[in-house]
């Protein structure tokens, strides 16, 4: 049960506690996944993903990825005769109203290696936008499908795709008290889930390191919130922050050398920065307000955070150059959980 208080400051206190230590969430959420909700194009362009020659596994992955993006509509009915590498008749696809076609083929290089040749064809321009070859081990064929989706998405939108990334999330299962909370990682389509940690106690705020080799999270296994970091390859974990009071909302610097987090070791929830090599702490905010949800800017020169220092929860920017703080949001009575794009 999540209780939202009526008064604004109580609401932000609730938010700070939820971000840093909240234990009670109804289902699987809390992923290191940025969700941008926007109006989908009224007529998303059609794209035909033709089954690859000698393979039936990759094209459904690409089709699913592009459909999930909301930027394209999969064309699957009343299509021209099956196209293949270097064999696309532009006129047939123009008549079918399909502006983009993806074809490909897979070849065995040896028992453990595949060569994947794929093409993205622009029907209107009658030219190939992509004509690429990937060589991958057999164990990474599925990952190659996501990589192809990334390339197609960027070629058509100008924006880098992230289908080949991974997501981290927490599952809560009240039916199994011994493993009520499970931290998992998976492909962006939810496939190939892997359990990182199972616990009777709440797990919150999973956060990737920039190199994606480790993940930080908040655990209540000692009956109070603490921030841990875990190596995904070895499973080795260590405590980063277990100070008196709240410890939560970890965020790594772009170079992976520092971490911002919220702590109340001195009574009030403030933002601290930890040097991950020396474990030295630096207090970044110091006032009577609730300061939480710090996130580094992509260039590492500043960070944004949520604070009620102006009377209501709003987003602020802290500059490392001069320690100045600037309010960024003014419209609305509640603005929180900001992130900065590159």
Task: Identify the residue ranges that each predicted region occupies.
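Short loop/turn segments that connect beta-strands within beta-propeller blades
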Residues: 124, 187-191, 231-235, 275-279, ...
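Hydrophobic beta-strand positions that form the internal "hydrophobic ladder"
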Residues: 167, 215-216, 256-260, 300-304
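Residue-level detector of Asp-centered blade-edge/turn motifs that repeat once per structural unit
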Residues: 161-163, 210-211, 254-255, 298-299, ...
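Short beta-strand->alpha-helix linker/helix-N-cap micro-motif
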Residues: 34-92
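A short beta-strand motif characteristic of beta-propeller blades
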Residues: 192-197, 236-241, 280-285, 324-329
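A flexible loop/linker signature enriched in serine peptidases of the S9 family
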Residues: 160, 172-181, 198-201, 218-227, ...
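Amphipathic beta-strand/beta-sheet edge segments enriched in Tyr/Trp
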Residues: 33-34, 63, 86-151
């Amino acid at each position: 049960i999540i209780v939202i208080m009526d008064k604004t400051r109580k609401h932000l206190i609730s938010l700070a506690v939820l971000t840093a230590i909240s234990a009670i969430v109804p289902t699987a959420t809390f992923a290191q996944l940025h969700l941008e909700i926007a109006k989908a194009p009224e007529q998303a362009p059609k794209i035909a993903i033709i089954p690859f020659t000698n393979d039936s596994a990759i094209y459904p992955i690409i089709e699913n990825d592009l459909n999930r993006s909301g930027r394209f509509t999969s064309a699957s009915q009343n299509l021209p005769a099956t196209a293949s590498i270097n064999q696309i008749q532009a006129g047939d696809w123009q008549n079918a109203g399909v502006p983009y076609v993806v074809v490909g083929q897979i070849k065995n290089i040896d028992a453990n290696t595949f060569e994947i040749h794929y093409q993205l064809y622009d029907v209107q321009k009658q030219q190939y936008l992509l004509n690429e070859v990937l060589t991958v081990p057999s164990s990474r064929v599925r990952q190659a499908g996501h990589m192809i989706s990334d390339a197609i998405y960027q070629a058509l939108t100008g924006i880098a795709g992230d289908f080949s990334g991974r997501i981290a999330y927490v599952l809560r299962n009240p039916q199994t008290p011994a493993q009520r909370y499970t931290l998992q990682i998976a492909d962006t389509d939810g496939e190939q889930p892997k359990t990182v940690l199972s616990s009777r106690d709440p797990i919150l705020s999973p956060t990737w390191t920039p190199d994606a080799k480790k993940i930080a999270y908040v655990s209540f296994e000692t009956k109070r919130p603490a921030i841990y970091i875990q190596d995904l390859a070895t499973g080795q974990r260590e405590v980063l922050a277990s100070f008196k009071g709240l410890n939560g909302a970890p965020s790594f610097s772009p170079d992976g050398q520092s971490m911002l987090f919220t702590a109340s070791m001195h009574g009030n929830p403030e933002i601290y920065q930890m040097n991950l090599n020396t474990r030295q702490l630096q207090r970044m905010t110091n006032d009577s307000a609730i300061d939480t949800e710090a996130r580094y800017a992509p260039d590492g020169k500043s960070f944004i955070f949520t604070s009620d220092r102006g009377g209501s929860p709003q987003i602020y920017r802290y500059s490392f150059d001069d320690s100045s703080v600037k309010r960024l949001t003014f419209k609305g009575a509640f603005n929180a959980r900001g992130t900065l794009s590159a």
